[in-house]
A protein has these predicted regions:
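ATP-dependent helicase/translocase motor core
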Residues: 1-331, 340-356
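Conserved, well-structured core segments
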Residues: 334
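Short beta->alpha hinge that forms the Motif I/post-I loop of the SAM-binding pocket
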Residues: 337
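Conserved small/polar residues in nucleotide/adenosyl-binding loops
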Residues: 363-365
Length: 365
């Protein structure tokens, strides 16, 4: 549970002041601030961070080859780059000696091996228009989270629309490193929301199709961005409180490495806070049951309640996926009490991960 932190006196706060305060809070939480404003410096830092994570020093030739083929491949779009973070985060480097070397883009096993940095006012001059981005979070040197701020009193949707303009005009520019962004955060100080990169990119695809069904809300529209909340589902809206919770390094790294689902339809889903809380509590109960040998007892079980349409299946899928990776778990059973739920669940599981559900393995009890 999170206790609200009182905000400063209600004096006028410019967007620049809000940005400065946000970065200060991130630094207090252990983020390293870097005065990076150009692509050259961004690439140089990326090389240094990957070398640090992988305990490996690239030769100039190796780095050029790895960067151009694995990181900034001109044939890769947002979907391909998302896959590299969510699924194919171990890339193979062909060393000058002819040997192969595994290079991690992100460490998903020991999340605090990842170096977290913050930059602001990054300049992109090679897009359709000259652009300055507000604040970006670098994880092992790659911009994986981007934050767009507006001063208090400005509608939050303006920040959402501005990110859409960036995607259209400049995220692809240069080496396209900003197409690695997985999660976007928008805030006007008073209200703060987050959403995945495919929410934004698919919104643009709809615009390109001529804006048919403009009144229809889809998963690509502003309405599908999410508020953050604590474990009791108390919504956290103010940027100050949001930063202390969502942007705590442990939480942010967990969201990026554990609580995203890259579906078979190539959509990136970022779980909602109550889904994350439910999943964590189930995994915690499983660990407790194992440590204290509570198998088969009431204390070794639990009950999670979600309302209709709130994403129960995604919660169960992610829980089953994470539980199956525990070293002492051999099998995860999923029990449904109606045939229509069985079909519906299999369909959803296969959407979250192709081949995750197999009807031939069903058992009638």
């Amino acid at each position: 549970e999170y206790d609200h932190v009182a905000t400063p006196a209600e004096a006028y706060q410019s967007e620049a002041d809000l940005e400065k305060e946000f970065i200060r809070l991130l630094q207090e939480q252990g983020y390293e601030y870097l005065p990076i404003h150009t692509e050259t410096d961004l690439i140089s830092n990326l090389k240094a961070q990957l070398e640090k994570l992988n305990h490996y020093h690239f030769t100039d030739n190796e780095w050029e080859q790895f960067f151009n083929t694995c990181i900034a491949n001109k044939n890769d779009d947002i979907v391909a780059k998302t896959a590299k973070i969510q699924e194919d985060y171990i890339q193979v480097l062909k060393r000058d000696t002819g040997e192969s070397q595994n290079i991690y883009l992100i460490d998903k096993t020991n999340i605090h091996n990842n170096f977290v940095q913050v930059i602001n006012q990054y300049v992109e001059e090679r897009g359709a228009h000259d652009t300055k981005y507000d604040v970006s979070i670098l994880v092992t040197g790659l911009p994986l989270v981007h934050v767009e701020l507006k001063r208090r009193g400005v509608q939050l949707k303006e920040a959402f629309n501005q990110i859409n303009r960036y995607q259209r005009d400049s995220f692809w520019a240069g080496c396209g490193l900003y197409e690695y962004v997985q999660v976007f955060v928008i805030s006007n100080g008073t209200n703060t929301k987050y959403y995945s990169n495919t929410t934004r990119s698919n919104h643009l695809k709809e615009q390109e199709l001529g804006g048919r069904n403009k009144s229809k809300k889809t998963s690509n529209s502003f309405e599908f961005s999410s508020f953050w909340a604590d474990s009791n589902n108390k919504v956290i809206t103010d940027l100050l409180d949001f930063t202390k919770t969502f942007f705590s390094k442990h939480t942010l790294l967990n969201i990026l490495t554990r609580y995203c689902v890259f579906t078979s339809e190539k959509m990136l889903m970022v779980m909602r806070p109550y889904q994350i809380a439910a999943t964590e509590r189930i995994i915690q109960r499983i660990n407790v049951a194992n440590n204290y040998k509570l198998y088969g007892s009431i204390k070794g079980g639990g009950y999670i309640w979600h309302t209709t349409g709130s994403g129960k299946t995604l919660t169960s899928f992610k829980t089953a996926q994470l539980a199956s990776r525990l070293p002492y778990i051999d099998k995860v059973l999923f029990v449904v009490d109606r045939k229509d739920l069985d079909y519906q669940t299999m369909k959803e599981y296969n959407r979250f991960e192709e081949g995750a559900a197999n009807g031939q393995a069903l058992i009638h009890i």
